[in-house]
Design a protein with these regions (language model features):
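Terminal alpha-helical segments
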Residues: 2-121
């Protein structure tokens, strides 16, 4: 089994370190976005719609950051210079899941807003 970390990699680990940093940026940003999304939902349920919107904006900012890094990695992959790793698969999964949750939470907050405006009818 080939290890791409440390001295086993062709470049002494420099490329993998850069890739790992990018992967952890995706994971961290997706995690921060997920936390902001659920905070937005909690705020909406409490009737704090302005605060909820701020949390949604923060989540969107974090997801854009993760997506931008993902796009850079995909470009490297198309050029054939990105080694596959389980950590990368995990990062992709975290980002995709959070993006799906964003869509669902946006709809849930919309329903909360609608119910609030209609007095629960």
């Amino acid at each position: 089994m080939t290890s791409y970390c440390g001295s086993d990699s062709p470049d002494g680990g420099a490329v993998m370190s850069e890739i790992e940093t990018a992967i952890f940026t995706i994971i961290t940003s997706a995690g921060e976005a997920r936390a902001s999304l659920y905070q937005a939902l909690d705020k909406a349920r409490a009737g704090e719609m302005a605060e909820s919107e701020q949390c949604m904006i923060e989540a969107d900012t974090q997801l854009k950051k993760a997506h931008d890094v993902q796009t850079e990695l995909i470009t490297r992959d198309l050029n054939g210079s990105l080694p596959m790793s389980l950590l990368l698969v995990h990062a992709q999964d975290q980002l995709m899941t959070t993006m799906s949750e964003q869509s669902l939470i946006e709809h849930m907050i919309g329903l909360i807003r609608d119910i609030g405006m209609n007095g629960g009818k």
